[in-house]
């Protein structure tokens, strides 16, 4: 599996590089970084004390010419540039980027008609199993329970609520036969009045080096149920991304998520 990594000098990029280097079936063939990054020209394995022979570069086409797969956990604007390159070079994509607008997501859907893409806000096995638990719980706590989603991440995260929190909200709303767009409440401030029981609330915490904590609260009268997933390391995301690469090896086109990769549909 000839794999290139986007955002190679970042926290997630480095975790992905390490995972690829430790996988006997994978070969690191490219490492993309943003233009102007001080890491450009460095060996991709320098942070591990390894000489991989792969240098960090901002030459998108040069990297795509070497790769069969690109793993991308960057930002929407960068990811869309990589999608264009994937179409030019027929490279399959594993995308963990969050913060896309509806219009940007439409670009991914269109691209998937020509190349195979796994697009998931969270690629950990635990989170994706949690989504199934939430669907089950929502069906049984549909009446008399208020639903709130609380997420916490490190101080550097730029979007809120997190993509994972939105995935959880969509899982719950879907199980209840609702559209998240119609029932989500993002944060509360001032005099808000009584809570509308049909809503799903979101709260976001940012601080320190929190990798990712997510809790879905079903609050009833006399009891509350909390379903929580906590990430202590990004390694689970990296391992999930490699599972997604293996899944794509048997696909030529189509847009998939981790529920497809893990056979949870």
Curated annotation (Swiss-Prot):
Residues that hold NAD(+) according to the record: 7-12, 33, 96-98, 120-123
UniProtKB keywords: Amino-acid biosynthesis, Cytoplasm, Diaminopimelate biosynthesis, Lysine biosynthesis, NAD, NADP, Oxidoreductase
GO biological process per UniProt: diaminopimelate biosynthetic process; lysine biosynthetic process via diaminopimelate
Residue positions binding NADP(+): 34
Matches recorded under SUPFAM superfamilies: Glyceraldehyde-3-phosphate dehydrogenase-like, C-terminal domain (SSF55347), NAD(P)-binding Rossmann-fold domains (SSF51735)
Localization: Cytoplasm
Active site: 153 (proton donor/acceptor), 157 (proton donor)
EC number(s) stated in the UniProt entry for this protein: 1.17.1.8
Binding site for (S)-2,3,4,5-tetrahydrodipicolinate: 154, 163-164
Pathway where it operates: Amino-acid biosynthesis; L-lysine biosynthesis via DAP pathway; (S)-tetrahydrodipicolinate from L-aspartate: step 4/4
Record has Transport as a keyword: no
Reaction catalysis annotation: (S)-2,3,4,5-tetrahydrodipicolinate + NAD(+) + H2O = (2S,4S)-4-hydroxy-2,3,4,5-tetrahydrodipicolinate + NADH + H(+); (S)-2,3,4,5-tetrahydrodipicolinate + NADP(+) + H2O = (2S,4S)-4-hydroxy-2,3,4,5-tetrahydrodipicolinate + NADPH + H(+)
Major enzyme class: oxidoreductase
InterPro entries: DapB_C, DapB_N, DapB_N_CS, DHDPR_bac, NAD(P)-bd_dom_sf
GO cellular component: cytosol
Gene Ontology MF terms in the entry: 4-hydroxy-tetrahydrodipicolinate reductase; NAD binding; NADP binding; oxidoreductase activity, acting on CH or CH2 groups, NAD or NADP as acceptor
Family the UniProt entry places it in: Belongs to the DapB family.
Purpose: Catalyzes the conversion of 4-hydroxy-tetrahydrodipicolinate (HTPA) to tetrahydrodipicolinate.
Protein name as it appears in the record: 4-hydroxy-tetrahydrodipicolinate reductase
Gene that encodes it: dapB
